[in-house]
């Protein structure tokens, strides 16, 4: 190549190893990583969950969707477990 590229990066023309080239560029680089990135997402997550009610909106009257109480959920889950149990026993006897 006749001279340095306008962007200042040399791709494949350097005699140095890539790790040394990256280390040399990183040492003099003006681009910095944001230090408050993790704190910002945590505080943003906290404010959004506190502002909208978070999980508690699931149990309020204004939440969209089907309203099912805890007793029907318990009954349906026990019926599902019983049905799986009966199918398991029925499959054992019809197989042998």
UniProtKB/Swiss-Prot annotation:
A cellular component annotation (GO) from this entry: membrane
Mode of membrane association: Single-pass membrane protein
InterPro entries: Sec61-beta/Sbh (IPR030671), SecG/Sec61-beta/Sbh (IPR016482)
Location in or out of the cell: Endoplasmic reticulum membrane
Bias type Polar residues, positions: 1-17
UniProt source species: Mus musculus (Mouse)
Bilayer-spanning residue ranges: 71-91
Post-translational modification Phosphoserine, affected residues: 7, 13-14, 17
Residues linked to a lipid group, S-palmitoyl cysteine type: 39
Quaternary structure note: The SEC61 channel-forming translocon complex consists of channel-forming core components SEC61A1, SEC61B and SEC61G and different auxiliary components such as SEC62 and SEC63. The SEC61 channel associates with the multi-pass translocon (MPT) complex. Interacts with TRAM1.
Alphabetically ordered keywords of this record: Acetylation, Endoplasmic reticulum, Lipoprotein, Membrane, Palmitate, Phosphoprotein, Protein transport, Translocation, Transmembrane, Transmembrane helix, Transport
Function: Component of SEC61 channel-forming translocon complex that mediates transport of signal peptide-containing precursor polypeptides across the endoplasmic reticulum (ER). Forms a ribosome receptor and a gated pore in the ER membrane, both functions required for cotranslational translocation of nascent polypeptides.
GO biological process, one term: retrograde protein transport, ER to cytosol
Biased composition (Low complexity): 40-50
Residues with PTM N-acetylproline: 2
Cytoplasmic side: 2-70
UniProt protein name: Protein transport protein Sec61 subunit beta
PTM-bearing positions, type Phosphothreonine: 9
A matching Pfam family: Sec61_beta
One example GO MF annotation: ribosome binding
Region called Disordered, residue ranges: 1-54
Major subcellular location class: endoplasmic reticulum
Family label: Belongs to the SEC61-beta family.
């Amino acid at each position: 190549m006749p001279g340095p590229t306008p962007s200042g990066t040399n791709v494949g023309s350097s005699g140095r190893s890539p790790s040394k080239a990256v280390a040399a560029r990183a040492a003099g680089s003006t681009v910095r990583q944001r230090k408050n990135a993790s704190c910002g997402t945590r505080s943003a997550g906290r404010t959004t969950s506190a502002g909208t009610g978070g999980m508690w909106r699931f149990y309020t009257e204004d939440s969209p969707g089907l309203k099912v109480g805890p007793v029907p959920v318990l009954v349906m889950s026990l019926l599902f477990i019983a049905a799986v149990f009966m199918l398991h026993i029925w499959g054992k006897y019809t197989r042998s």
